[in-house]
Amino acid sequence: MRKISLAFLLFSCLNKLTAQTTSVDALALKIPEASTYATSGLVNYLKQNFYPDSARVRAIYVWIANNIAYDVPRLLAKNANGEFKPQPSEDVLKTRAAVCQGYATLFVDLCTGLGVKAVLISGYGKIANTITPSHAWVGVEMNGNWYLFDPTWGAGYVQNNRFIKSFNNIFFKVPPEQMIKDYMPFDPMYQFVNHI
């Protein structure tokens, strides 16, 4: 009987967590367009409609990954050093397109506007056994722990120089010990892994 009660309790908690995430996702996808053309508008909407900070961060990930397309022309126009022209958040919101630096900058700016500690991380990423020459993702501190997010690869992928929208959760709130398998920050401090 005790095992059945424990199994039921575990199932109930898991079901509630899934329902909460589904609810946050549904609300994030319905953010009014008028609130999405400036970081201040998005921050205000998120403050008023999502709580706690974990729900706000989830809403940021879901909204960005579903509303910002990968900017393939910008990818192809990078300079000789493989660098992109900086892309401020307001430009990303205006064009609804970005490369990884723009996705990450917008994510960090929204978190910062909400009082959530976040950092933009640059380094190498590996996807489909191919190492990217340069990539950007986000570190967010939640409840005293650091988690990593990649809204770029959470939005979809590029195939034959075309962006294919394909939202996924693989790159949402990834523990550092897992992220290090496919991501290497230029600054080792942003591994957030204790090697001692």
Predicted features and spans:
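Secondary-structure boundary elements
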Residues: 21-99, 105-108
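Short, solvent-exposed coil/turn segments
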Residues: 18, 86, 131-133
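Bacterial Sec-dependent N-terminal signal peptides
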Residues: 1-22
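Low-complexity, Gly/Ser/Thr/Pro-rich intrinsically disordered linker/tail segments
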Residues: 169-196
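Short capping loops/turns at secondary-structure boundaries
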Residues: 12, 93, 97-100, 129-131
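A generic structural signal for ordered secondary structure
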Residues: 19, 42, 46, 139, ...
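Hydrophobic/aromatic-rich core segments of domains that either
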Residues: 102-178
